[in-house]
Amino acid sequence: MEWRADRFAGRDDTGKVVAMIGRLRELVGERPLIFTVRTKHEGGDWDPLRDHYRDLIADSCASGMIDLVDIQYLNPAAKRCLAAARAHRVPVLASNHDFSGTPAAAEIATRLEAMASFGADICKIAVMPRDAVDVANLLLATATRVRTSRVPLITMAMGPLGAVTRLAGQVFGSCATYGTLGDAGSAPGQQPLPE
């Protein structure tokens, strides 16, 4: 389960965030808990100051209650967030979300490699396709990159055009997808799951 802390009313107070992580840990039990703070630049609901973004990541990792932390690898605080995750032995999902379009397949593959070089344990990219060719480019980049990747990849195209990437991404090398409980997903095109 992913918890999007950028959507939490108490997000300005790291103590409240850590307390909520504790409550969520109790609710999800042994199921993996992913901690995410998505900034507006990458489709989130909030723009924390750089130090606050880092503090939220560091404190969530220090809590000992999360299983994976999502770090936007292009965020100015990314390297310090990675250091905090490593200090607490929390695996890192490096992510990049492009709501403006879909880069060429070679650029997608380059971004995925950059995330692996950054130190990610899992690399994730989400793009916004304009047409079927964009969807095909994402799938091509995934299938090409997975051949030489040292880490698992999660790739998806958002919106209605991208549905095929969420439902059949594993055929091309994506190791996971994101869905939603209920109607309100955190990104366009997330498939609803039964409760």
Where does each model-flagged region fall?
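Structural preference for beta-strand elements that scaffold enzyme active sites
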Residues: 2, 30-36, 66-70, 89-93, ...
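Catalytic beta/alpha-barrel core
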Residues: 2-8, 53, 61-77, 93-103, ...
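Active-site-adjacent beta->alpha loops and helix N-cap segments on the catalytic face
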Residues: 8-26, 72-88, 103-107, 130-145
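Generic structural signal for hydrophobic
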Residues: 24, 60-61, 85, 114-118, ...
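Glycine/small-residue-rich loop that forms an oxyanion/phosphate-binding "nest" at active or ligand-binding sites
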Residues: 33-71
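Short, acidic/polar
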Residues: 48-59, 104-114, 164
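Histidine/lysine/aspartate-rich catalytic loop segments that bind and position anionic ligands
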Residues: 84-121
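C-terminal alpha-helical cap/extension of soluble enzyme domains
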Residues: 143-195
